[in-house]
Amino acid sequence: MAMRQTPLTCSGHTRPVVDLAFSGITPYGYFLISACKDGKPMLRQGDTGDWIGTFLGHKGAVWGATLNKDATKAATAAADFTAKVWDAVSGDELMTLAHKHIVKTVDFTQDSNYLLTGGQDKLLRIYDLNKPEAEPKEISGHTSGIKKALWCSEDKQILSADDKTVRLWDHATMTEVKSLNFNMSVSSMEYIPEGEILVITYGRSIAFHSAVSLDPIKSFEAPATINSASLHPEKEFVVAGGEDFKLYKYDYNSGEELESYKGHFGPIHCVRFSPDGELYASGSEDGTLRLWQTVVGKTYGLWKCVLPEEDSGELAKPKINFPETAEEELEEIASENSDSIYSSTPEVKA
């Protein structure tokens, strides 16, 4: 029988998980940060989901979170009208950046010297993190609250999305280069540096555009409203999740749906591939993060594939090296998504 998905579940949040981001690969592996309406962003080991720490200091829902490339700094965007920068090693708050309204999105430059923010006041702000007392540079032009803002093209350009528009800006001149208009709300945006690809979701559509010109490349239609999508680092697969609680996996080249399965017990708000492409993470209204294998049955992280000769001649089956727990909801997902037997119900406790 074909093996299918059973995820690792990362518990600890008490409200919906609305954003997540991976660091780059460091000498210590890679890391995962999550933003949650409980106001307590969390840092985890990326390949296992093991909880490392919680960043304490926000006084409202945290809408956006990111890590710099080497996972030494974190940044968060919150409903308390602030963005914060943190030491991701010690957990200490390094600076608080006051805004005039709710902040929704944050992104570091590649050298971690500048932070880009956006939110409900419709302004993009660029902070020089080496001069925390200096006023930020501001870019105006959006006509509604900014949902996502990202550096692109080696930090020479900026991509930003509001309700129904995606805009491309020149960093040096602070002027708009081009914009894309949609007939419905843009739900998410992801930038892939290799190949300069922009992934945009709106309605049931997953669209791919050139990040340099905003010209269309291709698009897929999903069976349900999609809130987030992510492109595999080697551009093999696309994963997406949305309002029907399901995760969808597509072949990027052909657009063929390869898998679909129940992923959570609430709408899925965010999906991202790990930097090595071995797994992807999803965050949901149900308050959990879940980690999924890109190739099921492969030995990786907490997953271990038992070969036939190691298992009394039976078919190979994935096992998870993790203490046994009793979580009924994961058993339900396992029964729906798997034709194989797993050694335990995985759970990461924060």
Swiss-Prot record:
Sites bearing Phosphoserine, chain numbering: S312, S335, S338
UniProt-listed InterPro entries: G-protein_beta_WD-40_rep, WD40/YVTN_repeat-like_dom_sf, WD40_repeat_dom_sf, WD40_rpt
Its main subcellular localisation, reduced to a broad class, is cytoplasm
Q: Which GO terms describe its molecular function?
A: mRNA binding; RNA binding; signaling receptor binding; U2 snRNP binding
What keyword terms does UniProt attach to this protein? Cytoplasm, mRNA processing, mRNA splicing, Nucleus, Phosphoprotein, Repeat, WD repeat
| Superkingdom field | Eukaryota
The protein's matches in CDD domains, at most eight in alphabetical order, are given as: WD40 (cd00200)
Record note on quaternary structure: Part of the core SMN complex that contains SMN1, GEMIN2/SIP1, DDX20/GEMIN3, GEMIN4, GEMIN5, GEMIN6, GEMIN7, GEMIN8 and STRAP/UNRIP. Part of the SMN-Sm complex that contains SMN1, GEMIN2/SIP1, DDX20/GEMIN3, GEMIN4, GEMIN5, GEMIN6, GEMIN7, GEMIN8, STRAP/UNRIP and the Sm proteins SNRPB, SNRPD1, SNRPD2, SNRPD3, SNRPE, SNRPF and SNRPG. Interacts directly with GEMIN6 and GEMIN7. Associates with the SMN complex in the cytoplasm but not in the nucleus. Also interacts with CSDE1/UNR and MAWBP. Interacts with PDPK1. Interacts with TRIM48.
What does this protein do, in the record's words? The SMN complex catalyzes the assembly of small nuclear ribonucleoproteins (snRNPs), the building blocks of the spliceosome, and thereby plays an important role in the splicing of cellular pre-mRNAs. Most spliceosomal snRNPs contain a common set of Sm proteins SNRPB, SNRPD1, SNRPD2, SNRPD3, SNRPE, SNRPF and SNRPG that assemble in a heptameric protein ring on the Sm site of the small nuclear RNA to form the core snRNP (Sm core).
Which family does the record assign? Belongs to the WD repeat STRAP family.
Q: Name the PANTHER family on file.
A: EUKARYOTIC TRANSLATION INITIATION FACTOR 3 SUBUNIT I, SERINE-THREONINE KINASE RECEPTOR-ASSOCIATED PROTEIN
What is the designated name of this protein? Answer: Serine-threonine kinase receptor-associated protein
Q: Which organism is it from?
A: Bos taurus (Bovine)
